[in-house]
Amino acid sequence: MYENKKPRLSSLSSGPELGGVMGIDLHEYQTTINSRVSLSGTGVHGGRAVTIHLNPADADTGVVFNCMSDGELVREIRALVSEIGGTDLCTVLGDPSGLHVATVEHLMAALFALGFDNVSIDIDGNEVPILDGSSQDFVDAIDQAGIRTLAGKRRFIRILKPIRIEKG
């Protein structure tokens, strides 16, 4: 495992240049957050106070939401298309009428934009806090924690022919 010393993500460019700055091709290797980050706020739809903790994760873990109750893991929900339970007003992972995590899109956008592959997220409610209503607070918090490049190589999907998606 390669460990970088808290690079300022916002001060670096993304893409191959980022790897050049650190001496590692971040496009080739998986990444995780360098240290734990905690954010608290209110769920925009439920109005409840919620805290999330973003934790480093091993290669090939992916993004995982750990639904917690009184400090105990109740359910693990992976951020996979197969886990999408609804998209009315927000993105819901899990069972919308049961255990789920809602309003994940701003956090997921920040993780994707910053190039993270593996993050374990502890959440003490069923909705990610809205914070400032964008991804900026997530980006700023992750920026403070830094990025860790893992030994596992990324896997890519190669699109071999045009794909067309239509509705209706």
Model segments located where?
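C-terminal regulatory domains involved in ligand/effector binding and gene-expression control
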Residues: 2-117, 122-168
